[in-house]
């Protein structure tokens, strides 16, 4: 895990032997499970360290606290939520993943890593966000899903408590995308707080973190029914 260790040192993060072993286990189980269920196209040892583990950890640049209540929307193989949970074991983590096969992997890997305080939520984001158990209950919401920022705003901000934040990893030139998302962000009760450049060893390819602050309650009609935020973004 030398690539990961080097990158984390740039973030001021050092791992215990237990945490290092958790990352090794995560790597082995991910590659093994991926041979049966399509979780990721990235399977090389160094690539996973950089493009999955360190990329997930880069959210620490947004000032993550160890006692956050974090929701990872569209978690897939667990990124960025599970690496953040390994690094910050005191946080409470929700992994939202609608695909049953992926949700099953999340349940199994969480158990094998010995993590506690993790909830697997196997629902569509549009449905879960209308559930009082999850709506506006998180201090931090993230999603590494490949979606336009206008769509992501509608799928993430309703989960975020007022005063909390959404941190969305992005890549490349996002100026036009952010302009298109302005209306959706406002309608969800959010505002753009900052955009952080990610410049870490092995991750010097234009990655950014878009940080949204939740400043008011999301109106009850949002998010719209399943599929609408992606099909017809609020722009």
Curated annotation (Swiss-Prot):
One GO cellular component, as annotated: cytosol
Record-listed S-adenosyl-L-methionine binding positions: 74, 79, 97-99, 125-126, 144
Tagged with keyword Transport: no
Entries under InterPro entries matching the protein: rRNA_ssu_MeTfrase_G, SAM-dependent_MTases_sf
Compartments reported by the entry: Cytoplasm
Pfam families with a match to the protein in the record: GidB
Gene3D superfamilies: Vaccinia Virus protein VP39 (3.40.50.150)
Keyword rRNA processing: yes
Example of a GO MF term: rRNA (guanine-N7-)-methyltransferase activity
PANTHER family xref list: S-ADENOSYL-L-METHIONINE-DEPENDENT METHYLTRANSFERASES SUPERFAMILY PROTEIN
Family to which this protein belongs: Belongs to the methyltransferase superfamily. RNA methyltransferase RsmG family.
Protein name: Ribosomal RNA small subunit methyltransferase G
């Amino acid at each position: 895990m030398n690539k990961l260790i080097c990158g984390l040192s740039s973030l001021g993060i050092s791992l215990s032997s237990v945490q290092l072993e958790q990352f090794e286990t995560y790597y082995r189980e991910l590659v093994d499970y991926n041979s049966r269920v399509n979780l990721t196209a990235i399977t090389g040892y160094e690539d996973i360290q950089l493009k999955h583990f360190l990329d997930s950890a880069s959210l620490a640049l947004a000032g993550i606290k160890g006692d956050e209540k974090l929701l990872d929307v569209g978690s897939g193989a667990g990124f960025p939520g599970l690496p953040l949970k390994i690094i910050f074991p005191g946080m409470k983590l929700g992994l939202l993943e609608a695909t049953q096969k992926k949700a099953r992997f999340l349940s199994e890997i969480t158990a094998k890593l010995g993590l506690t305080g993790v909830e697997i939520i196997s629902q569509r984001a549009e449905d879960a966000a209308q559930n009082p158990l999850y709506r506006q209950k998180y201090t931090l919401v993230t999603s590494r899903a490949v979606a336009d920022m206008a769509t992501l705003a509608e799928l993430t901000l309703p989960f975020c408590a007022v005063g909390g934040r959404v941190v969305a990893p992005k890549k490349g030139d996002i100026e036009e995308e952010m302009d298109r998302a302005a209306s959706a962000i406002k309608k969800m009760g959010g505002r753009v707080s900052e955009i952080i450049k990610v410049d870490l060893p092995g991750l010097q390819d234009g990655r950014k973190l878009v940080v949204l602050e939740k400043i008011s309650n999301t109106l009850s009609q949002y998010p719209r029914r399943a599929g609408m935020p992606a099909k017809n973004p609020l722009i």
